Regions:
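Residues that define the transmembrane beta-barrel architecture of outer-membrane proteins
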Residues: 3-7, 44-48, 80-84, 98, ...
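Transmembrane beta-barrel domains of bacterial outer-membrane proteins
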Residues: 1-51, 67-73
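Transmembrane beta-strands of outer-membrane beta-barrel pores
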Residues: 17-19, 28-32, 70-74, 90-92, ...
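Outer-membrane beta-barrel "beta-signal"
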Residues: 85, 169, 195-207
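Membrane-embedded beta-strand positions of outer-membrane beta-barrel proteins
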Residues: 24-26, 52, 66-68, 84-86, ...
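Repeated loop/turn-to-beta-strand initiation elements of outer-membrane beta-barrel proteins
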Residues: 18-24, 61-64, 96-100, 134-142, ...
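Outer-membrane beta-barrel domain signature
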Residues: 1-2, 36-43, 73-79, 91-95, ...
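Structural signature of outer-membrane beta-barrel channels/translocons
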Residues: 14-18, 55-57, 71, 89-93, ...
């Protein structure tokens, strides 16, 4: 038998004017499992990220974006991955209770792994993404995001990031966030899995 202890924290901030939209988000997740028979503990998850995006609407629905993401995952032996990018987006629907947008652009990726070789990579990628959220019962938000990032120099190398969840308010700023997070890396560090799927329940702070 094992005893697991996990912590999941996140924040999400967004501001919208007539022609600009700014969003910033971050997340931290750690999990430790303890073998009750041997009393030995080992870390099964330890990762975090910060990301931000600025959108400039040159029409009511069309926008250009600048974004950046920095992430680290000790279990995946990822020391860091930094991804600044630019692109074009289209806001198909924007309402108080329903939003849907798509994006396409270019991203520069620089990463370093903590394996024996200390592998370092930098390359250009494309980026395709969509964002969907729908609010029910006036306050409970359902959301789904998907991001596909193929290496332009090697078609066999790509990343997929996706999540789907439910966010329910506890206070005016604090929400309970229950979600599935999926990440796929076609070229991970040695002896590491390509797929990482997590089922998280945690707290999110809304600005």
């Amino acid at each position: 038998n094992t005893d697991s202890t996990s912590v999941s924290l996140g924040f999400d901030a967004a501001r919208r004017s007539e022609i600009f939209r700014l969003s910033v988000a971050g997340s931290y997740f750690t999990e430790e499992q303890k073998d009750l028979s041997t009393k030995e503990s080992h870390m099964t998850a330890d990762n975090w990220y910060l990301k931000g995006q600025a959108d400039w609407f040159f029409t009511a629905k069309n926008f250009f974006y600048l974004n950046a993401k920095y992430e680290r995952d000790r279990i995946a032996l990822l020391d860091y991955r930094f991804m600044p990018g630019v692109g074009y987006g289209y806001q198909w629907i924007e309402r108080d209770n329903f939003n849907f947008s798509t994006e396409a652009g270019l991203t520069y990726t620089k990463e370093e792994y903590m394996d024996e070789d200390g592998e370092k990579n930098d390359f250009m990628t494309a980026r395709f993404a969509y964002h969907l959220d729908y609010t029910v019962l006036s306050k409970v938000k359902l959301y789904h995001n998907l991001e596909y990032i193929p290496n332009l120099e090697d078609s066999g190398v790509f990343l997929v990031n996706a999540d789907a969840g439910v966010q329910a308010p506890l206070t005016a700023r604090l929400s309970l966030d229950s979600k599935i997070v999926y990440a796929y890396n076609s070229s991970p560090a040695d002896d590491r899995y390509r797929t990482d799927t997590r089922y998280l329940v945690g707290l999110s702070w809304l600005f």
